[in-house]
């Protein structure tokens, strides 16, 4: 019951954050009036690969770099990050379920193995789908380096940790119960913390 309450609390907070809409057209136009560049100076490698000046989207001609299409990219970014957020809560629910099932399995309830494995596969698919949405979304307008620790930086640092832990959890499944369990709890702890720090 507390797990359901926790999940619904996270989901409700997420819904509230969707109401904070920005006027993308005004932001883009204001930015381009003062800056000739339509792209930020700093981008994640995956964003640069797809959306950089010489990225795949530019070379294929699907998204030439111009003001009109940059506005569409920012709308696409917003949609991808909203979906990333929704999938993130579904993944968190899967991780909580896995924690309960995994603990029971660890304590000798072998009949739960197939269920644990199936939910583990679903949770992994949702996790890596959500991660891809974030990593491959078009870049923001600006990405200036900020001094000190803030919620976005903390979210990114924790993302590095839970991504590594999720890879380890999948690699260690069926190989080392003790290490698999440690990786899974590390993934859950850092993932849940990443959601919390991003909201507050």
Question: Which residue ranges define each predicted feature?
Answer:
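Bacterial Sec-dependent N-terminal signal peptides
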Residues: 1-22
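N-terminal targeting leaders of membrane proteins
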Residues: 17-114, 130-146
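Serine/threonine-rich low-complexity intrinsically disordered regions
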Residues: 2-3, 23, 150, 176
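Hydrophobic alpha-helical membrane-anchor/signal-helix detector
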Residues: 77-106, 115-138, 153-174, 180-200
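Juxtamembrane helix-capping/reentrant segments at transmembrane boundaries
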Residues: 146-154
